[in-house]
């Protein structure tokens, strides 16, 4: 990137995450016909390479995060034009132009692209980065600490942490994990534990828990337990980071939901897909363990919730000022009470103010005691 005079680390990191998503999907679903890579000047073009990447990205977002990405592939155009009648030519072209103008985003633009010359400059950068990773396998059947550490390095350098968005250090995640009676919980449950982090950020808690399972379970048992790990993240970029991170650590089965964990269950489970991926995954009283470091002191967060969502909380009442209330940590506590079953455990990092403030904090303490 420095060679090509690209200094925007955050944008570069975002694009790198998208590239990793493409490669992870390709390795998982196209093992016998890999599409990730540049196949040489005699067999490929920059446009075709990016077309394949966009297709992989669309499929990866649908499969891993339940998100629908607008992308018009060469196959889509070929299929429609084969059936085209002259009188519909204008309408079809208008629809394609509308999608490309208003609904698509260049998910692989390390440089700003708004003409052919800039497209070719960016394509050269993209080709070189794709070639860097094409011959390496990102998805593993077992933990690959090197790949995990590599991605952690990219994360620390490429994503700025500021007020309200701090990643939980791995050491803190491990300390909390060691404090839990995990072996006892596993032995008491005949089925895999359903585990959730409802503010998963970059996925540190999820990956630490998944790694800790290796102390108690066989390789055959691990995959089933991974399938019962859920992370919810409201920030779009971080939801993608969490999915890539889990794959890098060899834990690709972990479920990441791009959603607002405080929304009503119907809204939190909504996505643009049909069938199996659209089925609700977060239900009340359905989890055995919650581990999280949710945000705190977020002014006006209630304004982002629908009336239906707000009314699912006992803490919400007419006396609360929706515009100024910042007690988001209290609502995360009540949400924990809603999604955990009667025998569940919760390990949540909270500000000390939850122990001594009055008003809504007093009501939150009552929920915790109950």
Each predicted region: which residue ranges?
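Long recognition/docking surfaces used for binding and targeting
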Residues: 21, 28-156
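Conserved Class I SAM-dependent methyltransferase catalytic core
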Residues: 321-370
């Amino acid at each position: 990137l420095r060679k090509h005079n690209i200094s925007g680390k955050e944008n570069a990191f975002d694009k790198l995450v998208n590239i990793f998503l493409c490669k992870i999907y390709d390795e998982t679903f196209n093992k016998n016909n890999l599409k990730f890579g540049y196949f040489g000047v005699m067999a490929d073009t920059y446009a075709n390479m990016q077309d394949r990447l966009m297709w992989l990205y669309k499929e990866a977002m649908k499969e891993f995060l339940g998100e629908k990405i607008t992308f018009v592939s060469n196959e889509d155009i070929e299929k429609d034009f084969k059936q085209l009648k002259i009188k519909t030519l204008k309408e079809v072209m208008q629809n394609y132009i509308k999608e490309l103008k208003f609904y698509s985003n260049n998910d692989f633009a390390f440089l700003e692209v708004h003409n052919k010359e800039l497209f070719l400059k960016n394509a050269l950068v993209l080709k070189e980065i794709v070639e860097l990773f094409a011959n390496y396998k990102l998805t593993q059947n077992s933990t690959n600490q090197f790949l995990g550490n590599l991605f952690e390095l990219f994360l620390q350098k490429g994503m700025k942490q500021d007020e309200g968005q701090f990643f939980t250090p791995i050491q803190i995640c491990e300390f909390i994990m060691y404090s839990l009676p995990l072996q006892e919980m596993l032995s008491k449950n005949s089925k895999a534990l359903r585990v959730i982090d409802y503010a998963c950020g970059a996925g540190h808690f999820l990956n630490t828990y998944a790694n800790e399972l290796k102390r108690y379970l066989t390789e055959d048992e691990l995959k089933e337990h991974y399938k019962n790990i859920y992370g919810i993240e409201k920030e779009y970029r971080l939801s993608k980071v969490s999915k890539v991170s889990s794959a890098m650590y060899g834990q690709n089965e972990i479920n990441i939901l791009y959603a607002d964990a405080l929304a009503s269950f119907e809204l939190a489970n909504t996505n643009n897909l049909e069938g199996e991926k659209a089925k609700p995954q977060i239900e009340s009283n359905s989890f055995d363990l919650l581990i999280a470091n949710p945000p705190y002191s977020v002014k006006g967060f209630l304004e982002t919730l629908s009336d239906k969502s707000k009314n699912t909380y006992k803490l919400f009442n007419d006396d609360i000022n929706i515009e100024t209330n910042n007690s988001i940590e209290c609502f995360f506590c009540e949400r924990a009470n809603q999604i955990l079953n009667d025998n569940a455990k919760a390990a949540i990092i909270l500000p000390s103010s939850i122990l001594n403030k009055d008003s809504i904090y007093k009501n939150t303490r009552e929920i915790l005691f109950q």
